[in-house]
Amino acid sequence: VKRAGAGVKRAVAAMKPEVGVSETAPGDVSPRLGVSSCLLGQPVRFNGGHSRNRFVSDVLAGYVEWVPVCPEVEIGLGAPRESLHLTSEGQLVSTSGQDHTAAVTALAQRRRTELAGLAGYVVKSRSPSCGRSSVRVHAGGQIVTGNGREVFAERVLAADPLLPAEEEGRLNDPLVREAFVEQVWARARLHRLFGGPWRLRDLIGFHARHKLQLMAHDPVRAHQAGHLVAIAHAGPDDQVRAEYTALFGAAIARRVSRARHCNAMHHAFGLVSDHLDDTRRRDILATIEAYRRGEVPLSVPVTLLRHHADGCSAVYLAAQTYLDPFPAGLGLRNHAPGPSAPSGKSGQSRQSDRAPAPKTAADATKGARG
């Protein structure tokens, strides 16, 4: 497998610049995202109002193609209208007791084809018709839980379990926002790869460009995906595409810990260190360590690595999607996680997930060239 990985790297290095580098530009991809219509400012809520979200309607809108959805309006209910609620039996019922479950289920079935090619989905939190996991569930006229999943979203996600989907409220968390956007752009690039005729050479280049990004998310699946690419010539195209899509999607869906970010950056450092003097090497290692301690945003060491990759004409590193996983204009990766951030909420890794920080440039480059 190591020999196969080296072969993948050599194949990308031999590619023409327009294939090996320019395809990684995140601005070249315009992801299609589903979105609750009210988040775009459309007056479709039960009270005739909207829930316009600035990040969705002002920031993301400049980079994506929205596919607005409002199940309640699309099944013929007007705005304003009776409010709906989700029952403990999973039914979508109006205040007067009318059951709209079958209508929303049929709508999800009708829109399945259009929604199948999405790169992500932003839903309205607590909405009984398009919320994801914080929908209030009623029983006997009382709210019994706030963790329901409404009828429409349940069916959309059941058809595509790895679809990146978030409620707009959770996107206020900078790490949740960053993880969601990264998944969306990675999925959009995968759709572009497999959206038409493709060759093994295309898959080899795609995987090589995503090597560090996959390593940061899920080293085990990254290894499995690399092995699949290495033996892809022996399998049917449809099978290779299905297996790679599943591995890639599951890997990207895993949140990146701070320790794995540092590991990926040390690998990146190993690809450029031979071209740098000792001062620049120490600068890079110091910024990676500062990020490990939670003192600086991820953008600081990544920007430094990108700068040196460009300056040294390190084509393989410059082409890595890890350095530019989404458009810079989105302003992500600019939060310092802090030294005491818990693992599940802001990316701080568990102690057992940590690798010891390298003390010298030589330590950092050990094993970083595979």
Which residues does each PLM region occupy?
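Compositionally biased, intrinsically disordered low-complexity segments enriched
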Residues: V1-V19, P339-K359
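Short beta-strand segments
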Residues: S36-S37, C70, V122-R126
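Short N-terminal binding/cap micro-motifs at the start of the first secondary-structure element
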Residues: L40-G48
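Short catalytic helix/loop segments, enriched in acidic residues and glycine
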Residues: G49-W66
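Short, surface-exposed acidic-centric catalytic microdomains
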Residues: S57, P68-G90
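Glycine-rich anion/phosphate-binding loops
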Residues: G97-L115
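Internal, conserved structured core segments that host functional sites
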Residues: T113-G195
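Acidic, Ser/Pro/Thr-rich low-complexity regulatory regions
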Residues: A165-A341, K345, D353-R354, K359, ...
